[in-house]
Structures are given as structure tokens and as C-alpha cells.
Amino acid sequence: MSEATLDHAVAALTDGSKVRIPFWHIDSGRPGEKFMVLAAQHGNEVQGCEAIRRFKEVCERELVAGSVHLVPFANLPAVRHRRSHISLGPEQPYGDDEGHNMNRTWPGKAHGNDTERLSYALNEAVARHCTRCLDLHSWSRFTATATLARLDGGLSEQMARVAGIRFIQWRKPPTGSNDGTTIGALFNDSGRGSITIELAPQWVIRENEVSLGLRAATNLAKLFGMIGGEIEQIDPTWSSAGRMTMRRCASTNSRRPARGCSWRPDSRPRST
């Protein structure tokens, strides 16, 4: 067994206070990938927090190569504030982020706004040392859990195909500056490999979605040779190159998209 070590990324905020963001580090003692799993970049997206806690227990029992770095509360002030961003007040919509959408601030700035400082602290303490990343979210515009990944023949595509999530939404690589980007783009643009999973919806923790997040993290660890055993797959998977189509074509109780939507069976072979 490999015992988890609790550590903290320390962010110095603009008012002079400090935030200690907790993360677990589990090292197998053998060479291998350094796998980062994080959740709650937005403070009301908490399903991934429980998935990470359970994945920690799996890794403590079964990790045979490499190391994992588990961040259950990436945006700890927003989690405490019960808002998507630390800048939001009551009834303010998600879009009023004013530069505080954490997943648009990577790799962060040492002397930026408070959210940029949180990202900077996590990047320095965890992300820049890791080779693979799973970013767990809970966007309520998805009514079924879905993977977001790059369809580029690279690591992101490979990871998406083995995660064990029924729906995959393919996205093109971003264009333009890397100054203030998603953590997924930060990893993928540097050749390290990342996917995002939306464990819908927000505000709640549900057994089904937590189980899906745990399965995805475990499958990825198996893909990377960090945990033994067969990858647990589902059949079929459905994919789409569109955006914002999940609302009208999928539900948590359906086994296939609704008639007329843009989701199609994914026919490409999976990596194992």
C-alpha cells in the first residue's frame, strides 16, 4: 500500500492574507506518470470532490507505478463562498466573472487578481510537475455526464476514449495567446495530455455521477500503467463535434441521444 501525504499550495492574496489549498500526494516509489486530478475550480461544482476522495483510497491500495496528485478543492475560497467564482454576489450569473473564472487563468499570475494567484500557487506546487491531468467539473448545461477533449490524434483523444463516459464532445485546439487559459489547454499545448469531464449537475453530489468520475480516474490510471487490471468500458459511446447540444439530446436516464440531434455513435477504436 502507498500512503497519501497531505500537502498545501499556499496562495498570497491581494489583501495580504493567505489561502492554503489542500492536496494529496501518493507516490508508488516506482517510475511512471505524474497524474493530477482536480475538482471545484468553480465553487458550486462539487461532485468531483467526492470522486477524488474515493480515488485516493483506490490509489492507496492499488498504485503500482508513478504518482498521483489529487486536488479536491482547487478554488477553495469559491467553495466556501458557494459561488462559481469568488467575485460573485447573490444572484449574479456565471458570466459575470470579471476575470475570476479560474479555468481561464492558468498558469496563473503571482501578482494578479486573487483567482490568478490561486491558479499560480497550484501550478507551482502541483500542475507544472505533472504529466497528465483530469479536470472534473459540473456544468448544469449538460444534462448527462460528458467528456470534453481534443480530437487531434493525441493524448487527449486517447484519454477520452478510455475514460468510460458515454458522451464525448470533441473540441478544436484553441488559437491565440496562452496567457490565461484552461488547465486542459495548459497540459495539452505542452504535450502532457488532459481531458475535462462534466459531472452534471452543479450544487449537488450524486452517487451515479461520483461513480462515473471515479471510474474515469481509475481507467486513466490503468491506461497510464499506474494501476493494474482491465479498463472498464461501456458500449457504445456517442460523440459530437458541436457545442451546447447535450441539453436537447441527452438525459441521465437515456441510453442514446434524442432523435435529430448531432450526437453519433463513436466508431473509432479505443486505446487499451
Q: How should these model regions be labeled?
A:
Residues 1-272:
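Structured catalytic-domain cores with a bias toward divalent-metal coordination
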